[in-house]
A protein has these predicted regions:
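Beta-strand/loop subdomains of soluble extracytoplasmic proteins
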Residues: 71-75, 80-89, 123-129, 140-153, ...
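Terminal peptide-recognition signature
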Residues: 27-29, 54, 60, 64, ...
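Short, conserved beta-turn/loop elements at beta-strand boundaries and strand-helix junctions
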Residues: 34, 49, 70, 93-97, ...
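Active-site region of chymotrypsin-like
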Residues: 25-31, 36-37, 42-45, 105-115, ...
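Conserved active-site neighborhood of the chymotrypsin/trypsin-like protease fold
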Residues: 58-140, 174, 199, 319-321
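N-terminal activation segment of mature serine protease catalytic domains
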Residues: 19-65, 74, 123-128, 212-226, ...
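C-terminal recognition in membrane/secretory proteostasis and scaffolding
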Residues: 58, 66, 89, 103-105, ...
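Bacterial N-terminal signal peptides
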Residues: 6-15
Length: 480
């Protein structure tokens, strides 16, 4: 009996030691990446070396941040206290949620490594521990902090998506990205971003977002976090609520904009959203999600692509129950592009490229101020305010490469193309067709924002085109 108890004690001791050493399953990641030059889209930037963190999950995979592996030409991973590097590649990446899964070519890499279990959303005031490989050293680092709030925030990686995140005062520094945030030997988050100018403020991606990502890739394809295609606004005014015959004083938010075809099919502007996916919607547009008051959009984004979300709305003095389809917007020009090289068309020294957030970011840190109201309106707002005038792919004259054929042009770039040879330009294909199908003696290019037009001699432009490409080292006149 004594022998049995000793063995049982040793077994339990080993389990405790193993559970208390999650760092063995935390991986150091080295990337060698090369981003395009969005202002000169035929070029690429210099190769950049960076480090990040990750951790082992079920299925012999490594979870990390999407931004850690974006534009990576080569990825190397290294185990805890092991100097040997191993080649890895991206299996799945979700830029909208800033998560990625890596696979390692050497199957022996995972021998002896225990997958870290994914826990639940931590409560405010919980103590959490971050583990990773921050910049400034080679060894693993541990920091502790307290969960201060849970809310939807803008994810820096896509730039235009707000998903659930947890704020903590645990240090999350460059290199920590992708590492696990632990509580009670379970992963309660993936470290991913801080706030410039604020000390002791870091954010991690919580289990609901992680589990959504993992469920999404079960069919071997990542779709993303869907949207309902609506915009909510508060409905606080008691007089207006009385006018609408709403009885509950704090239930229901106004649907003030419909941004997708599916939303327009089922809903009307000025409908009142009472409930979404079982969550009552407060007058201030929030819902109570696992004990946290967060924006009601989470009721739709936590659904899977092409699923239907049950909703209750108030319309014409009565309650309606509907099922609202939600979809991922694959043509979202507002979201940062992380793998596909930018499109361009080069003709007579004129470089054309689509208007996108990535293109505007090439203007510098204060890109929104440099871009001006006209370009911001075209990119962000026109499709909602003037859908009939919205372009599927607005085209920019990015720059003009100097040559005698274009020497007299006064407009030298960073302007929106409105039409070419009298044909409205809604996409890059429209632009190319307008140039190549034109038989007149001159090309007339009209620009947006009432900037006027420029004119090119067609025969001279055609003769000069190849020479200009060779002079500036451009191998192809287009990339689509």
């Amino acid at each position: 009996m004594k022998t049995i108890l000793i063995h049982l004690f040793l077994f339990l001791f080993l389990l405790i030691v193993e559970a208390a050493e999650p760092e063995k399953s935390v991986i150091q990641i080295f990337t060698f990446s090369q981003e395009p030059d969005w202002d000169e889209p035929w070029n690429s930037s210099q190769v950049r070396r960076a480090t990040g963190s990750g951790f082992v999950i079920e299925g012999d995979r490594i979870m990390t941040n999407a931004h850690v592996v974006s534009w990576a030409k080569q990825i190397m991973v290294r185990r805890f206290q092991d100097s040997r590097p191993h080649l890895a590649q991206v299996a799945y990446v979700g830029h909208d949620c800033d998560l990625a899964l890596l696979e390692v070519e050497d199957e022996t890499f995972f021998e002896g490594l225990k997958p870290l279990p994914i826990g639940v959303l931590p409560e405010v005031r919980s103590v959490v521990n971050t583990i990773g490989y921050p910049a400034g050293g080679e060894q693993i680092s541990y920091t502790s902090g307290v969960v201060s709030r849970v809310e939807l925030i803008n994810y820096v990686q896509p730039g235009n998506r707000s998903l659930l995140a947890v704020q903590t005062d645990a240090a999350i520094n460059p290199g920590n990205s992708g590492g696990p945030v632990m509580m009670d030997d379970q992963v309660v988050g993936v470290a991913f971003q801080g706030t410039p100018g604020l000390e002791n403020t870091g954010f991690f991606i919580p289990p609901p977002v992680i589990q959504h990502f993992l469920k999404d890739v079960q069919d071997t394809h990542y779709h993303g976090f869907p949207q309902a295609g609506i915009r909510l606004s508060p409905l606080i005014n008691p007089a207006y609520r009385k006018y609408l015959k709403l009885e509950a004083p704090d239930l229901g938010a106004r649907i003030d904009t419909l941004m997708s075809d599916s939303a327009k099919e089922f809903l009307r502007e000025d409908d009142v959203l009472l409930e979404a996916n079982g969550y009552p919607v407060s007058a201030d547009t929030t819902i109570l999600y696992e004990g946290n008051q967060v924006h009601g959009g989470i009721a739709f984004s936590q659904a899977q692509h092409k699923s239907k979300v049950p909703v209750k709305i108030w319309r014409d003095g009565g309650e309606l129950e509907l099922e609202l389809p939600v979809f991922v917007n694959y043509k979202d020009r507002l979201e940062g592009n992380q793998y596909v090289p930018p499109k361009y068309f080069a003709y007579a020294g004129l470089i054309f490229t689509p208007l996108s957030r990535d293109y505007l970011s090439s203007f510098g840190q204060n890109w929104s101020a440099v871009a001006g109201i006209g370009l911001l309106y075209e990119l962000f707002y026109r499709k909602n305010t003037e859908p009939e005038r919205s372009r599927t792919e607005p085209v920019m004259l990015s720059t003009v490469l100097a040559h005698p054929v274009n020497a007299n042009m006064e407009i030298r770039g960073r302007v929106l193309v409105d039409s070419v040879n009298g044909k409205r330009i809604d996409s890059m294909n429209d632009l190319i067709k307008a140039f190549e199908s034109h038989e007149g003696s001159h090309h007339l290019i009209e620009f947006g924002e009432r900037l006027g037009f420029e004119c090119l001699d067609r025969d001279a432009a055609n003769r000069a085109n190849n020479q200009i490409l060779q002079t500036y080292g451009i191998q192809l006149d287009r990339q689509l």
